[in-house]
A protein has these predicted regions:
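Signature of the chorismate-utilizing enzyme
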Residues: 1-213
Length: 213
């Protein structure tokens, strides 16, 4: 029997090095190098190979420890793309090690795979109950009143939330909730902030003149 590899996540750690460090010592035969004016970038190893359209979500999924905090620090994707799109979309690489000298500062970023088991939260609840805060009749009444107000021109749009109360024998892990929402609601915007977790099918913005909020 072949064991299933443990799931992993990627973690990137960036640390500053002295300028004058030979950036190209990081470069390997199958690596990447970019030198222009005062900027030097060298990379080696591959932790992910991604299509251009997947670069942003791939980088955003990496846990980052980056005290440098400037453009180009932290994890990056590198590579070359075909000039003629008929030759294929091309692919970019997230390297295992990147050394950068931007003309003012120099740093090294290392990316490693970390077993998910090392960062998982507590065991999920073994028992829980879900109880609607409103009865079926109360919910129908809310819908009817909303439709009536729309019909009278008092509202153009209304979003009704049906509250439920969930009680469990142990705390829920926000990470587990987010993971399940991503799996069960693939077309939604999944979010979590300070214990407020959810999935929305739409992203709402409001424009005031030239400002969007």
């Amino acid at each position: 029997m072949t064991a299933t590899p443990a799931p992993v996540r990627l973690r990137a750690v960036t640390h500053e090095v002295e300028r004058g460090h030979d950036v190209l010592t990081t470069f390997s035969a199958d690596g990447f190098a970019w030198v222009h004016a005062g900027t030097r970038i060298a990379a080696s190893g591959v932790v992910a190979r991604v299509a251009p359209r997947d670069v942003t979500p791939t980088l955003e999924a990496i846990e980052v420890d980056d005290p440098i905090g400037v453009v180009g620090s932290g994890p990056i994707a590198v590579g070359g793309l075909p000039f003629d799109a008929r030759r294929g979309p091309g692919a970019l690489v997230v390297p295992a090690r990147v050394t950068v000298d931007n003309g003012e500062r120099a740093w090294v970023t290392d990316i490693e795979a970390v077993p998910v088991a090392a960062v998982t939260g507590p065991e999920p609840p073994s028992r829980f109950s879900v109880v609607p805060a409103q009865s079926r009749d109360e919910w129908r009444d809310m819908v009817s009143r909303a439709l009536a107000r729309i019909g009278h021109g008092q509202l153009e749009k209304v979003v009704l939330a049906r509250e439920v109360v969930i009680e469990a024998d142990s705390p829920f892990s926000p990470r587990e909730v987010v993971t399940r929402l991503i799996s069960q609601q693939p077309g939604c915007f999944v979010y979590a902030t300070e214990g407020f977790v959810g999935a929305s099918p739409e992203l709402l913005v409001r424009r005031k003149g030239h400002d969007v909020e």
